[in-house]
């Protein structure tokens, strides 16, 4: 069940949802706004002939930090990784979903391509999959609102929450935009 602002504040007060830094002004009727950090991962398209999810490709992306009060310019058709300014930690019976902001979507900014779900037990910065589908560059200002987290109460605590190691925990504790680690547990069914 999606939880309300009142319940979000109660879960934050009891430390079952932890957002650091926490700004009470970011709480909305059924979500909490999150801001973008100053770190981005850009794809180096000339390092590999193709992307292979089964292989480790350590030079596929490079980390860039925006300096001072400058924006990051996301060009039309460009895809980069960013991350939330906030660290997010969830109790074993709370999951979250990252959604974009309508006002930014109307400008052509997609906040996440596919990975908007955050498992119970997760702790770390949330990696953003940012795409510009507009025809003009978009300025991304560190500290600006970039999305919103909606929280869900599970019917019971997860038997193996994220970070327990049972189902994998490749991104537990991540800081900044984290490149894909799909090669670590790549699965392919022979068909």
From Swiss-Prot:
The active site is at residue 129. InterPro entries: dCTP_deaminase, dUTPase-like_sf, dUTPase_trimeric. Residues 171-183 have a biased composition (Polar residues). CDD domains: trimeric_dUTPase (cd07557). Its EC number is 3.5.4.30. It catalyses: dCTP + 2 H2O = dUMP + NH4(+) + diphosphate. Gene3D superfamilies: 2.70.40.10. Residues 165-191 are annotated as: Disordered. Pathway: Pyrimidine metabolism; dUMP biosynthesis; dUMP from dCTP: step 1/1. Keywords: Hydrolase, Nucleotide metabolism, Nucleotide-binding. It comes from the Bacteria. Disulfide bonds: none annotated. Belongs to the dCTP deaminase family. Homotrimer. This is dCTP deaminase, dUMP-forming.
């Amino acid at each position: 069940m999606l939880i309300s602002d009142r319940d979000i504040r109660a879960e934050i007060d009891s430390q079952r949802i932890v957002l650091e830094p926490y700004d009470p002004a970011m709480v909305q009727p059924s979500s909490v706004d999150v801001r973008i950090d100053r770190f981005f991962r850009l794809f180096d398209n000339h390092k590999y002939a193709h992307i292979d999810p089964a292989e480790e490709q350590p030079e596929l992306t490079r980390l860039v930090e925006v300096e001072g009060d400058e924006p990051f310019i996301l060009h039309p058709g460009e895809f980069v990784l960013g991350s939330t300014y906030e660290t997010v930690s969830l109790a074993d019976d709370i999951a979250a979903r990252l959604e974009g902001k309508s006002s930014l979507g109307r400008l052509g900014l997609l906040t996440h391509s596919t990975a908007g779900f955050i498992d119970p037990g997760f702790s770390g910065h949330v990696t953003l999959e940012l795409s510009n589908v507009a025809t003009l560059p978009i300025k991304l200002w560190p500290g600006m609102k970039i999305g919103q987290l909606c929280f869900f109460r599970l019917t019971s605590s997860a038997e193996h929450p994220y970070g327990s190691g049972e189902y994998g925990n490749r991104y537990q504790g991540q800081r900044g935009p984290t490149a894909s680690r799909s090669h670590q547990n790549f699965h392919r069914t022979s068909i």
